[in-house]
Amino acid sequence: MEGESTESTHNTKVSDSAYSNSCSNSQSQRSGSSKSRLSGSHSSGSSGYGGKPSTQASSSDMAVKRNKDKSRKKKKAKSPAQATAATTTTIKSLEQTEEPLLVKPNNGSCEQQLELQDAQQLGAPTPSDAHDAHGDKPQLDVDEQQDDPQAEQIQQLETATAATISPDTMSASVTVTIDGCTSMEKTCEWTDRPGRLEAHAACIGKQHVQQQQHDRVKEDSFCCVISMHDGVVLFTTANLNEMLGYPREMWLGRSFIDFVHIKDRATFASQITTGIPIAESRCSQSKDARTTFCVMLRRYRGLASGGFGIIGRPVSYAPFRLGLTFREAPEEVQPDGCTLSNATSMLLVISATPIKSCYKEPDEFLSPKGPKFAIQHTAAGIISHVDTAAVSALGYLPQDLIGRSILDFYHHEDLSDIKDIYEKVVKKGQTVGATFCSKPFRFLIQNGCYILLETEWTSFVNPWSRKLEFVVGHHRVFQGPKQCDVFEMSPNVTPNIPEDEQNRNACIKEDILKMMTETVTRPSDTVKQEVSRRCQALASFMETLMDEVARGDLKLDLPHETELTVSERDSVMLGEISPHHDYYDSKSSTETPPSYNQLNYNENLLRFFNSKPVTAPVDTDPPKMDSSYVSSAREDALSPVHGFEGSGGSGSSGNLTTASNVRMSSVTNTSNTGTGTSGGENSASGSSNPLPVNMTLTEILLNKHNDEMEKCMLKKHRESRGRTGDKTKKSVIEKMPEYSGPGHGQTMKRGGSHSWEGDANKPKQQLTLSAVVVAPTVSVSPAEDSQTTAKWQAPMTGSHLFQSSYNFPQSINLWPPFSLGLTTPTVHTTHTSMAQKSFSPQHNLFPAFYYIPAPLATATAGSAAAQTSVSSASAAQHSPKSSENPSTSQPEATAATAMPMPYMAGVMYPHPSLFYAYQPMPFPSVSGAVQMSVQSSGSQSNNNNKSIYTMAPASTTTQKPGAFHSITPAELNKPDAPDTLLHTETSPKISVQEAPKKELSDLPSTSARRGSSSDQRNNSNNPKKYTDSNGNSDDMDGSSFSSFYSSFIKTTDGSESPPDNEKETKVHKLKPIVEHPEEDQTQHGDG
């Protein structure tokens, strides 16, 4: 026996050790003495059995020694009738035993059994034994079921277990004897309440068996209850012997997992772990919720079936379908009133039903009502699910098939038909729920035979991935195998298949797998894909085309500069072509291609041409220009005049901060320093430049000029916008002297914007009082030759010319590189008083353009007004060399009471707001200042349509109001000088240069219209223009013009035609202007 118990192989580990420790004697078997159960030599070592006692429901406060129970029981009084009844009960139990071996009875255990029987039958136990009698289980026999004491004991058991069991429904085969309970009490050391959990397990087992008998009367099964605390068997039914051959007592206290096949233990454990959470949430589950799976349980190897040769016999297993149900033991009440929870005493009720082969005869044909089962496999051919109904037909348990390839079970001769079947499966899978039936094919079963199956196929294609997910075959056995027992092990015989056949079969299997793993395409998908491909191609072509159009020559790709200054951001780009320049990176400013037509003066010129004026060139000789005018004319040709209210795009009224306004002489410059350059170095070069000839402005010439200027404007804009983000203010300032043109510091800005962010709060109308400069002036005489032009012009401070005892060399740069100004209180205090006295136009530097106004109805007959306007051409700039000296001037203003004037065709009028937008800035008179006298140029003809271009003289003794100041009648009545020549006085150290009158008339921006009172009275017959409340003409509202265009427009009486040499020089004048766009650096600004 020791050899059997110590055998290491699993063939003899479980059954033989349990068999060697079992007792055939009913008294010793049922007494469960500690001597027979706890003997170390014959213990099997299995959990909950033999030498490994359980610790379930044991605690220190409930532990009571067994010897005290024996001592109390020995003191009881025994009667012969009670002993006879107990002996009869044990004899009946002995007859039911199945073990042939005999063992000497244990007298102590028999005595204990008798004492317990006496106490239970009396029904009134002693107070000292009441606790023990209440905890023991009663013995129930058929002959004693009607006794009152036993009926009362049954009621107590029902109350303790919360189960309703009627005594008449119990049978002897399912009753639990006292000896079994005491045996478990001894083995598991359940002190204080011996057999309580077993009694509860027994009641649950009896209920389960009764339910099985009620539901499945014809099906044989056994039931067992397992403790989830340690996994031992607490209860099992007697028909266990019929199913597996084990005596019922051999399973008690043994671990259930020892009887499960090794390959099925993982399945059993997984079902337990998944079933426990379901059992714990019983509030939402049915009380008898079951989990069903199949395992192989071990058969018993007894002497009756195999004799005494135990080691050499193989261990056999039988398939069973197990149903799992979880129950929980109720709470127990201790003597002290405390409640002990049995949460750890969760019970597992297993109902085991044997599975038998469904075939009765070899190769039998089954009816359509034959066994049906389903097998599911993936697109890779791996089986993922098998019904439990397939076990009786195939002999495989579900866990035996899951994970294996379905192609391994098909007969090799049927693979061609299987391939056709799967082609149809994939095709039908495109329709959800579509099924089809295939012709029968052979399938391999457990015993190595083949059965013939009729299958209904269905498949599922993922609508998103368009791939086959799984295939389900609903099989029905059409013909059975040659061997009926499907659970027999198949002989390890490999079928003899030729090599070429094997290769062909392998190729067919690969084709089937490839077919199932490929993406499923529908016929309509092909059309959709083609349409989608064409749409994508069209979209790609359109994007490419749009990109090419967007990358045209006029597109400006502006960089995203992160360090733009305030002035750069607020500056007007491209002559203020767009009103959306609030932010430099706005979409409108970066994506709108610049248009030259948006410039204000171009619009006004178009209005001028639309009015269809009668224009003709003057009858005088072709005018000539000196180098200073050439330089200024080139710049003014590109300079847009804007920034007034009502002009297209600016919206700022009166703030003349653009480049063209800088050149409008000293009266409109918004800089704080005076204008003036040191031009002595340029005398030779200036005189040698070819002098362009005035040309008649025509619409064709304007369009040609606009086209050329637009290209230059785009070029300038790209260059100015191509700066990097890390360019600092210092680098910008250093770059400014490279630009040509006067007043380049005053770049093209919006009205109200500042020149630089460093002087954001600097007043716009200030005077620089710190530097009083003695200006070398020019004395002009009519007797000089044309080559002796005046090249020395005086720099001005505060729009004044001064003569002082301080003499400066001609070549010294008298001006700072940038226009800076200082706020001086003197300027503001003397502003009002000296406005009319300390300001006088510098006619020798800034050409004046006189208008002949019509007298008002309320004015006297001899009163008229002559207003002066200064064009944007600055005479201070002589050549590109002198452009390094920024020349600026202080703006002058006139009174608001401007007289209305008649419109004169061909005459360019400045914006009306220029006459009153700026107040004249005073400057204290300096002793010894240059004396200037204005001399009359003679009387004019009565037609008043001819322009006489002369240089305005400097005042001698009296200072007159600004150039835009309205001329009062009192001033007109003053006698004029006898001759029309202009002259100035220079300092003693400066030589006087003279020029003929013909060359002085070459300055196109300078014209003086003077006449007597009779001439002015003749002017009153002219039609009166529409004027506003301020007396301003609305003919050219909201516009100003550059000197380039003002030089074109001349009026005449129409009696003369332009000379031939003027026609010849039209193109020559425009060409040098266009060829030098770089000289006009102030047109587009710095940003």
UniProtKB/Swiss-Prot annotation:
GO MF term list: transcription cis-regulatory region binding; transcription corepressor binding
Chief site of localization: nucleus
Motif range (Nuclear localization signal): 65-78
Domain PAS positions: 220-355, 373-479
Source organism, top-level taxon: Eukaryota
Disordered: annotated segments: 1-98, 123-153, 613-692, 736-759, 871-893, 956-1087
Listed Low complexity bias regions: 15-46, 79-93, 665-689, 1028-1047
Composition bias type Basic and acidic residues, residue spans: 129-140, 1060-1087
Basic residues: compositionally biased ranges: 65-78
Keyword list, A-Z: Biological rhythms, Cytoplasm, Nucleus, Phosphoprotein, Repeat
Compartments, as annotated in UniProt: Nucleus; Cytoplasm, Perinuclear region
Keyword Nucleus in annotation: yes
GO annotation (BP), single: entrainment of circadian clock by photoperiod
PTM description: Phosphorylated with a circadian rhythmicity, probably by the double-time protein (dbt). Phosphorylation could be implicated in the stability of per monomer and in the formation of heterodimer per-tim.
Alphabetized Gene3D superfamilies for the sequence: PAS domain, Single helix bin
InterPro entries given in the database record: PAS (IPR000014), PAS-like_dom_sf (IPR035965), PAS_fold (IPR013767), Period_circadian_regulator (IPR050760)
Main function: Essential for biological clock functions. Determines the period length of circadian and ultradian rhythms; an increase in PER dosage leads to shortened circadian rhythms and a decrease leads to lengthened circadian rhythms. Essential for the circadian rhythmicity of locomotor activity, eclosion behavior, and for the rhythmic component of the male courtship song that originates in the thoracic nervous system. The biological cycle depends on the rhythmic formation and nuclear localization of the TIM-PER complex. Light induces the degradation of TIM, which promotes elimination of PER.
PANTHER family: PERIOD CIRCADIAN PROTEIN
Assembly mode: Forms a heterodimer with timeless (TIM); the complex then translocates into the nucleus.
Protein's recorded name: Period circadian protein
Gene: per
